[in-house]
Regions:
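C-terminal capping/gating helix-and-loop segments adjacent to ligand/active sites or protein-protein/ligand interfaces
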Residues: 240-276
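Paired acidic/hydrophobic, glycine-rich loop segments that form the ligand-binding mouth/hinge
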Residues: 142-147
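Short helix-initiation/N-cap motifs at beta->coil->alpha
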Residues: 47-53, 122-137
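Glycine-centered hinge/linker elements that transmit conformational signals in sensory
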Residues: 55-57, 94-124, 167
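Periplasmic solute-binding protein
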Residues: 6-44, 69-92, 114, 176-185, ...
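Hinge/lid segment of periplasmic solute-binding proteins
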Residues: 1-29, 38, 51-53, 79, ...
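Extracytoplasmic/periplasmic substrate-recognition and gating elements
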Residues: 40, 115-118, 155-219, 223, ...
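Short, solvent-exposed loop/beta-turn-alpha elements that line the ligand-binding surface or hinge
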Residues: 1-4, 85-106, 156-157, 169-175, ...
Length: 276
Protein backbone atom coordinates (compact mmCIF):
# COMPACT_ATOMS: atom_id res chain seq x y z
CA UNK A 1 0.00 0.00 0.00
CA UNK A 2 2.92 2.36 0.58
CA UNK A 3 3.42 2.65 -3.19
CA UNK A 4 0.06 4.41 -3.68
CA UNK A 5 0.15 8.21 -3.59
CA UNK A 6 -0.86 9.17 -0.01
CA UNK A 7 -3.24 11.96 -1.00
CA UNK A 8 -5.14 9.50 -3.20
CA UNK A 9 -5.03 6.45 -0.92
CA UNK A 10 -6.46 8.45 2.00
CA UNK A 11 -9.77 8.70 0.14
CA UNK A 12 -9.99 4.88 0.03
CA UNK A 13 -10.63 4.41 3.74
CA UNK A 14 -13.93 4.19 5.57
CA UNK A 15 -14.22 4.03 9.35
CA UNK A 16 -10.48 3.31 9.58
CA UNK A 17 -10.51 0.40 7.14
CA UNK A 18 -9.24 0.26 3.56
CA UNK A 19 -12.27 -0.38 1.34
CA UNK A 20 -11.04 0.58 -2.15
CA UNK A 21 -7.97 1.22 -4.31
CA UNK A 22 -7.22 4.48 -6.20
CA UNK A 23 -7.86 4.25 -9.94
CA UNK A 24 -9.23 7.13 -12.04
CA UNK A 25 -8.17 10.06 -9.85
CA UNK A 26 -7.79 13.75 -10.60
CA UNK A 27 -7.26 17.17 -9.01
CA UNK A 28 -8.60 20.59 -10.00
CA UNK A 29 -6.04 22.71 -11.88
CA UNK A 30 -5.87 25.98 -13.78
CA UNK A 31 -5.47 25.80 -17.56
CA UNK A 32 -4.32 28.89 -19.41
CA UNK A 33 -3.82 30.02 -22.99
CA UNK A 34 -0.08 30.59 -23.34
CA UNK A 35 -0.52 32.60 -26.54
CA UNK A 36 -2.90 35.01 -24.83
CA UNK A 37 -0.55 35.26 -21.85
CA UNK A 38 2.32 36.21 -24.13
CA UNK A 39 0.21 38.87 -25.85
CA UNK A 40 -0.71 40.34 -22.44
CA UNK A 41 2.91 40.30 -21.22
CA UNK A 42 2.24 37.55 -18.65
CA UNK A 43 4.79 34.79 -18.14
CA UNK A 44 3.45 32.45 -15.45
CA UNK A 45 0.16 31.14 -14.15
CA UNK A 46 -1.34 33.18 -11.27
CA UNK A 47 -0.36 31.95 -7.81
CA UNK A 48 -2.72 33.88 -5.53
CA UNK A 49 -6.29 35.11 -5.82
CA UNK A 50 -4.98 38.64 -6.26
CA UNK A 51 -2.80 37.39 -9.13
CA UNK A 52 -5.85 35.69 -10.64
CA UNK A 53 -7.89 38.89 -10.54
CA UNK A 54 -5.06 40.99 -11.99
CA UNK A 55 -4.26 38.50 -14.76
CA UNK A 56 -7.93 38.05 -15.64
CA UNK A 57 -8.27 41.83 -15.98
CA UNK A 58 -5.21 42.00 -18.24
CA UNK A 59 -6.59 39.17 -20.40
CA UNK A 60 -10.14 40.50 -20.75
CA UNK A 61 -11.10 42.36 -23.90
CA UNK A 62 -12.20 42.02 -27.52
CA UNK A 63 -15.07 39.73 -26.59
CA UNK A 64 -12.95 37.46 -24.41
CA UNK A 65 -12.96 36.91 -20.65
CA UNK A 66 -9.87 36.40 -18.55
CA UNK A 67 -11.26 33.50 -16.51
CA UNK A 68 -14.05 30.91 -16.51
CA UNK A 69 -15.11 28.36 -13.91
CA UNK A 70 -18.25 26.26 -13.38
CA UNK A 71 -20.25 27.34 -10.34
CA UNK A 72 -20.38 23.86 -8.86
CA UNK A 73 -19.48 22.18 -5.60
CA UNK A 74 -16.11 20.65 -6.55
CA UNK A 75 -14.56 23.86 -7.83
CA UNK A 76 -16.07 25.83 -4.98
CA UNK A 77 -14.61 23.26 -2.57
CA UNK A 78 -11.13 23.75 -4.05
CA UNK A 79 -11.35 27.48 -3.32
CA UNK A 80 -12.77 26.85 0.17
CA UNK A 81 -9.81 24.59 0.92
CA UNK A 82 -7.36 27.14 -0.49
CA UNK A 83 -8.93 29.63 1.94
CA UNK A 84 -8.29 27.29 4.88
CA UNK A 85 -11.63 25.47 5.15
CA UNK A 86 -13.27 22.15 4.28
CA UNK A 87 -16.80 21.21 3.29
CA UNK A 88 -17.41 18.94 6.29
CA UNK A 89 -15.58 18.99 9.62
CA UNK A 90 -13.19 16.22 10.71
CA UNK A 91 -15.96 14.11 12.26
CA UNK A 92 -18.17 14.64 9.18
CA UNK A 93 -21.15 15.69 11.28
CA UNK A 94 -20.96 19.43 10.62
CA UNK A 95 -19.63 22.01 8.18
CA UNK A 96 -16.02 23.12 7.87
CA UNK A 97 -16.50 26.31 5.87
CA UNK A 98 -18.08 28.73 8.35
CA UNK A 99 -16.84 32.31 8.11
CA UNK A 100 -14.20 33.47 5.65
CA UNK A 101 -13.35 30.07 4.07
CA UNK A 102 -16.96 29.73 2.92
CA UNK A 103 -17.70 33.31 1.92
CA UNK A 104 -14.42 34.48 0.39
CA UNK A 105 -14.64 32.19 -2.69
CA UNK A 106 -18.15 33.50 -3.38
CA UNK A 107 -17.02 37.11 -3.05
CA UNK A 108 -14.08 36.34 -5.36
CA UNK A 109 -16.41 35.04 -8.05
CA UNK A 110 -18.97 37.83 -7.55
CA UNK A 111 -16.26 40.50 -7.81
CA UNK A 112 -14.78 39.03 -10.99
CA UNK A 113 -18.21 38.64 -12.59
CA UNK A 114 -19.10 42.23 -11.69
CA UNK A 115 -15.78 43.41 -13.15
CA UNK A 116 -16.55 41.58 -16.38
CA UNK A 117 -13.43 39.41 -16.14
CA UNK A 118 -15.13 36.08 -15.32
CA UNK A 119 -17.21 34.03 -17.74
CA UNK A 120 -19.92 31.86 -16.16
CA UNK A 121 -20.46 28.71 -18.28
CA UNK A 122 -24.05 27.65 -18.86
CA UNK A 123 -25.60 24.49 -17.44
CA UNK A 124 -24.75 22.51 -14.32
CA UNK A 125 -22.32 19.77 -13.35
CA UNK A 126 -20.74 18.08 -16.38
CA UNK A 127 -22.66 20.24 -18.85
CA UNK A 128 -21.22 23.35 -17.24
CA UNK A 129 -17.71 21.91 -17.30
CA UNK A 130 -18.05 21.10 -21.00
CA UNK A 131 -19.26 24.65 -21.70
CA UNK A 132 -16.25 25.96 -19.76
CA UNK A 133 -13.81 23.90 -21.84
CA UNK A 134 -15.53 24.98 -25.05
CA UNK A 135 -15.14 28.63 -24.01
CA UNK A 136 -11.43 28.02 -23.48
CA UNK A 137 -10.87 26.19 -26.76
CA UNK A 138 -12.91 28.77 -28.65
CA UNK A 139 -11.01 31.73 -27.25
CA UNK A 140 -13.84 33.08 -25.08
CA UNK A 141 -11.83 32.51 -21.87
CA UNK A 142 -8.06 32.70 -21.39
CA UNK A 143 -7.99 30.74 -18.10
CA UNK A 144 -10.28 28.00 -16.81
CA UNK A 145 -10.50 25.90 -13.68
CA UNK A 146 -11.03 22.25 -14.64
CA UNK A 147 -10.08 18.68 -13.80
CA UNK A 148 -6.52 17.51 -14.44
CA UNK A 149 -8.10 14.62 -16.37
CA UNK A 150 -8.99 17.07 -19.15
CA UNK A 151 -5.37 17.83 -20.06
CA UNK A 152 -5.04 15.54 -23.07
CA UNK A 153 -8.42 16.52 -24.47
CA UNK A 154 -7.66 20.23 -24.21
CA UNK A 155 -4.19 19.88 -25.71
CA UNK A 156 -5.73 18.01 -28.65
CA UNK A 157 -8.67 20.38 -29.13
CA UNK A 158 -7.07 23.79 -28.61
CA UNK A 159 -5.29 25.50 -31.49
CA UNK A 160 -2.91 27.22 -29.09
CA UNK A 161 -0.35 26.12 -26.51
CA UNK A 162 -2.01 25.05 -23.27
CA UNK A 163 -0.35 25.84 -19.95
CA UNK A 164 -1.15 24.32 -16.55
CA UNK A 165 -0.86 25.82 -13.10
CA UNK A 166 -2.06 25.13 -9.58
CA UNK A 167 -5.45 26.51 -8.59
CA UNK A 168 -4.61 29.97 -7.19
CA UNK A 169 -4.52 30.06 -3.40
CA UNK A 170 -5.76 32.45 -0.75
CA UNK A 171 -4.00 31.21 2.39
CA UNK A 172 -2.87 27.66 1.61
CA UNK A 173 -2.49 24.99 -1.08
CA UNK A 174 -5.06 22.24 -0.57
CA UNK A 175 -7.28 20.36 -3.02
CA UNK A 176 -10.15 17.87 -3.08
CA UNK A 177 -9.13 14.80 -5.07
CA UNK A 178 -11.74 13.83 -7.65
CA UNK A 179 -12.37 10.80 -9.81
CA UNK A 180 -13.12 7.27 -8.66
CA UNK A 181 -11.75 4.21 -6.88
CA UNK A 182 -12.13 0.48 -7.49
CA UNK A 183 -13.80 -1.70 -4.87
CA UNK A 184 -15.47 -5.06 -4.30
CA UNK A 185 -18.90 -5.79 -2.86
CA UNK A 186 -19.65 -8.34 -0.16
CA UNK A 187 -22.01 -11.24 -0.61
CA UNK A 188 -20.24 -13.23 -3.31
CA UNK A 189 -18.69 -16.69 -3.26
CA UNK A 190 -15.10 -17.17 -2.15
CA UNK A 191 -14.13 -17.96 -5.74
CA UNK A 192 -15.75 -14.76 -7.03
CA UNK A 193 -14.12 -12.67 -4.31
CA UNK A 194 -10.69 -14.11 -5.14
CA UNK A 195 -11.25 -13.34 -8.83
CA UNK A 196 -12.41 -9.83 -7.97
CA UNK A 197 -9.32 -9.20 -5.86
CA UNK A 198 -7.04 -10.42 -8.66
CA UNK A 199 -8.82 -8.06 -11.05
CA UNK A 200 -8.36 -5.09 -8.69
CA UNK A 201 -4.66 -5.88 -8.32
CA UNK A 202 -4.31 -6.22 -12.09
CA UNK A 203 -6.05 -2.91 -12.82
CA UNK A 204 -3.98 -1.01 -10.25
CA UNK A 205 -0.53 -2.52 -10.78
CA UNK A 206 2.25 -0.22 -11.92
CA UNK A 207 2.20 -1.21 -15.58
CA UNK A 208 -1.54 -0.76 -15.97
CA UNK A 209 -1.64 2.38 -13.85
CA UNK A 210 0.86 4.00 -16.24
CA UNK A 211 -1.12 2.74 -19.24
CA UNK A 212 -4.35 4.09 -17.75
CA UNK A 213 -2.81 7.49 -17.00
CA UNK A 214 -1.41 7.70 -20.52
CA UNK A 215 -4.65 6.69 -22.20
CA UNK A 216 -7.13 8.68 -20.12
CA UNK A 217 -5.35 11.68 -18.65
CA UNK A 218 -6.02 10.60 -15.06
CA UNK A 219 -3.27 10.78 -12.46
CA UNK A 220 -0.64 8.07 -11.96
CA UNK A 221 -1.80 6.53 -8.68
CA UNK A 222 1.50 4.93 -7.61
CA UNK A 223 4.94 6.34 -6.91
CA UNK A 224 6.36 3.49 -9.00
CA UNK A 225 4.34 4.85 -11.95
CA UNK A 226 5.97 8.25 -11.60
CA UNK A 227 9.40 6.61 -11.28
CA UNK A 228 8.92 4.37 -14.32
CA UNK A 229 10.85 5.11 -17.50
CA UNK A 230 7.62 5.10 -19.51
CA UNK A 231 6.06 7.84 -17.40
CA UNK A 232 9.27 9.86 -17.30
CA UNK A 233 9.22 9.80 -21.10
CA UNK A 234 5.61 11.03 -21.04
CA UNK A 235 6.60 13.93 -18.77
CA UNK A 236 9.56 14.76 -20.98
CA UNK A 237 7.22 14.99 -23.97
CA UNK A 238 4.61 16.98 -22.02
CA UNK A 239 5.93 18.95 -18.99
CA UNK A 240 2.34 19.85 -18.06
CA UNK A 241 2.06 16.34 -16.61
CA UNK A 242 4.74 17.10 -14.02
CA UNK A 243 2.91 20.24 -12.90
CA UNK A 244 -0.23 18.17 -12.36
CA UNK A 245 1.58 15.38 -10.47
CA UNK A 246 3.17 18.00 -8.22
CA UNK A 247 -0.33 18.95 -7.01
CA UNK A 248 -1.17 15.48 -5.66
CA UNK A 249 0.71 16.14 -2.42
CA UNK A 250 -1.84 18.86 -1.66
CA UNK A 251 -4.84 16.52 -2.02
CA UNK A 252 -5.42 16.57 1.71
CA UNK A 253 -9.20 16.17 1.88
CA UNK A 254 -11.11 13.02 1.01
CA UNK A 255 -14.68 12.95 -0.24
CA UNK A 256 -16.86 12.09 2.77
CA UNK A 257 -18.29 8.56 2.92
CA UNK A 258 -21.63 9.65 4.36
CA UNK A 259 -25.18 9.06 3.07
CA UNK A 260 -25.92 12.79 3.06
CA UNK A 261 -23.09 13.70 0.69
CA UNK A 262 -25.06 13.51 -2.57
CA UNK A 263 -27.85 15.60 -1.08
CA UNK A 264 -25.27 18.11 0.19
CA UNK A 265 -23.77 18.40 -3.32
CA UNK A 266 -27.16 19.29 -4.77
CA UNK A 267 -27.78 21.87 -2.03
CA UNK A 268 -24.38 23.42 -2.69
CA UNK A 269 -25.04 23.68 -6.42
CA UNK A 270 -28.36 25.42 -5.86
CA UNK A 271 -27.16 27.77 -3.14
CA UNK A 272 -24.00 28.79 -5.02
CA UNK A 273 -26.16 29.77 -7.98
CA UNK A 274 -28.35 31.87 -5.67
CA UNK A 275 -25.35 33.61 -4.10
CA UNK A 276 -23.74 34.49 -7.41
Amino acid sequence: MSDFMPGLLDASYYDGALVALPHSRSVPVLYYNKDRFKEAGLEEAPVTWDDLKADAKALTGNGSYGYSCPLDQWYYMSLVMNAGGTIFNETEDGIGFAGDPGTKPLYLWKEMIADGTMHVPSGQDYNSSEACRNAFAGGTAAMIQQSSAQLKGLEKTCEFEVGVGAVPQDTTLSYPAGGSNLLMFKGHSEEEEKAGWEFLKYMTNTENAVRWANGTGYLPTRQSCIDSEEYKKMVEEDPNLQIIVDQVQYSTYKTPFIPQYQEAKEIFANEIQKCI
